[in-house]
């Protein structure tokens, strides 16, 4: 008899319901989906704002575990001791025996086939590595996609580093997001060179490009480019429902630098 049950489960969202287009990344998407088919632990690494979370969601949607894919957002978890509780909560598990959360998870995963996505684990790497290692050893049907800026360094881990967008992809992303702010916007002979240079100066980082495109209602591509010297101050804004660490380029980079502090 099971002593726990699901309550308000939180499976991975359907990428087809996203409100903005998923631009580029076709090769990376194929590669990551293939990695998830051949390795039980895949860690998607890359700098802040490079698009790891969205790629992970699309790749996870291509997998076909019997009980689906489940995502745990860890960026807001500051205490390593709360990692296991965060996973229990994301899975919607309610335990009625006062067992430790790790035991609840071990029992839950023991005979299930599913994909667990741990997103934003980099500041909790030791706690996550310990949990993932034990879960994989005791749950043969479990696969894990870890998403962060560093490896977990767990046995059997397959790394999948994510680079910034290519120049054509970056320009396409800028044009798509700009058209949402300025109806009818499109790349043409009058703005193409400025947009390409803008994306190059932003190093192909999707978050930075989206924030820049969001300023297009007030500034032209040429004006954005001219003011890019102070890019941290310029790129202020972002969607209200974005993660706190993604509201500004300054915050995204600050989040990355925080991880380097002893």
PLM feature spans:
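Aliphatic-rich helical/repeat scaffold segments used for oligomerization and domain docking
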Residues: 1-262
